[in-house]
């Protein structure tokens, strides 16, 4: 494909236009009085959302150079979301402010490399200050963090705190759509383990990059599956039931994995493969735990069982299974409660008789996974559009709360960044030239989140920033007043603030040091076919050869 090139200031200007287009769409959502963004969908009703990462993913610009700038800022949102689960809008606003200041200085002749060095030194100092200011979180602070992350929705904050109280902070909490209008919390049997899907082609939700099945069957085995012949009988049996199938095995690869992917993508069977957790004897124990939870049987070489003799009675059953790239969560039915209790009692007896510290640790982990259960927040709303938006808010609140438990909390509303900005004055005095300018770029950018929160609340952003700097208090966007935000319960997770700042500087420093941009030349639109048929008469799509699975392909 032919390429287009832009150089020097022209290239950076194009990237900045693209960045601003995306950032301006995202920044209106920040704060408790942030606005919504309407996203047109190819099918169905449009989505009305308030989530920065979701908005960023939807934006594609017509100009290829501007689109590259937009995609660079998209990376800020997605990286922050992946690592912290929240703070995407803050990271985007910070990155935009740093890029604008950085490009203004490079256009005036500053060295991009020296600017970057100064910016990195400034961020290192701010991160250190965040660590010193952060406070551990417990009790009502968990509810407050969740409430702030959910845009001031106190019901969401209360529900997240209640879920964490019931299954502990380390427990499994999932979010699903309710069949009623009410949002409810339910604690059920279930477990999660750190293994994801064997192939990304099993994904059923492209936006969240997860595979999710309701009322699924589970095939549990400690064998490695490579030959498709081993799976043909059970696949044909499951296909007749119409239920999804999840295969937990030592490994599924080769011809077997390829066949599962093809059948899933053709819509023949809802299926996914996951590597069984742990290793060796501990893997067998983990599979046995999952079998108890789901009412299934482990197809094991130790018991001389073969895959081609598997029946429906051997398969486990789960109310819902969610599989991400790195984790699998199984929500079981209520029928397994007694069996799980017996299994936990058995493991406790084994724990009492164990002298090995390592073995005791692993046994305690198994007990926690089985006994802890899964808290399910069932989200209800009058319309599908509102339901999707509310579900995103709850997921953000959950992620922010987990981040707060990890690294503590700081005052929210952008006030902590403003207060830490003062610590950069000493660093700036130690540096000279463009490195000092880099520190000043970060100093000015740190006020951008608070300024935008104030603007979204209908206040004058510059006046609010000046008042917060002078008074040392924070701006409460809900009331329009100034107060101690820690005491008011307006809190941010320190991890979210830290990652948002670090990711913003990372992308901003890359963008201001760019000298050449290479983009694909857009393909000209195809001319309509002659003869009056705009489709040109599509030829038949030749059938794909079977893969040795009668009745499946």
From Swiss-Prot:
The organism's taxonomic lineage, starting at the top: Bacteria, Bacillati, Cyanobacteriota, Cyanophyceae, Synechococcales
Enzyme Commission number(s): 5.6.1.7
Top-level enzyme category: isomerase
GO biological process, one term: protein refolding
Biased composition (Gly residues): 533-542
Descriptive protein name: Chaperonin GroEL 1
Major localisation: cytoplasm
Location relative to the cell: Cytoplasm
Keywords assigned by UniProt, alphabetized: ATP-binding, Chaperone, Cytoplasm, Isomerase, Nucleotide-binding
CDD domains the record matches: GroEL (cd03344)
Top-level taxon in the UniProt lineage: Bacteria
Reaction(s) catalysed (UniProt annotation): ATP + H2O + a folded polypeptide = ADP + phosphate + an unfolded polypeptide
Biological role stated in the UniProt entry: Together with its co-chaperonin GroES, plays an essential role in assisting protein folding. The GroEL-GroES system forms a nano-cage that allows encapsulation of the non-native substrate proteins and provides a physical environment optimized to promote and accelerate protein folding.
Region feature Disordered, mapped onto this chain: 521-542
Subunit relationships: Forms a cylinder of 14 subunits composed of two heptameric rings stacked back-to-back. Interacts with the co-chaperonin GroES.
One GO CC term on file: cytoplasm
Residues involved in ATP binding: 29-32, 86-90, 413, 476-478, 492
Entry's family note: Belongs to the chaperonin (HSP60) family.
